[in-house]
Structure formats: C-alpha cells, structure tokens
Amino acid sequence: MTNPTDNPMVEPLIREFIARNILLSDTGFPHSDDVSFLQEGIIDSLGVMELVEFVQETFGVKVEQSEVTPEHFDSVTRLAAFVRRKAAAAESSAS
C-alpha cells in the first residue's frame, strides 16, 4: 500500500493501472492527465468499479458509493486529487 498524501507516484500508478487493466495496453496511457475518461470513452461503468477497487487496495483509502462521481473519477488529475484528499482526511482523523 502506498501513502498517497504527498506521493508523486499517484498519477503514474493510476495511468499504469488504466493502461494495463482497462485499455489492455503495454504502451502506457495515451492521454493527458486532464482528459475526461467518460467523454473520451476510456472507462465504462465496469471500468469505474475496477478503478474504485484499485484505489482502495493500492492507496488504502475507503471510497464510499456516494463518492463515485465524475467529480472524483473522471480523469487522472481528478482521481489523484481525490485520493490525496481522502488520505489526508484519514491521516488527520487517525491523529
């Protein structure tokens, strides 16, 4: 499990997961970090569920069903920011 609060590897890990597990590509994530997964047809509803599981297992953050929205899961940038916010909130509540 990776501590994502200040980890620069959050975006690369997300890109790699999407490339390998959703796009089934060995050549990497072929889009910019701000590209909308939904508008570009990169991820469907099943892919979103895979992404939720990946985030929970890789970064150790709990994702509530109500948080699975385009605001949080529609681009690498948005997802990385969400992961960092969740990790920071978990750290502050554990203190």
Predicted segments with their positions:
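Conserved catalytic core of two-component sensor histidine kinases
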Residues: 49
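Thiotemplate assembly-line natural product biosynthesis machinery
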Residues: 2-30, 81-95
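Phosphopantetheine carrier-protein modules
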Residues: 22-42, 60-69, 92-95
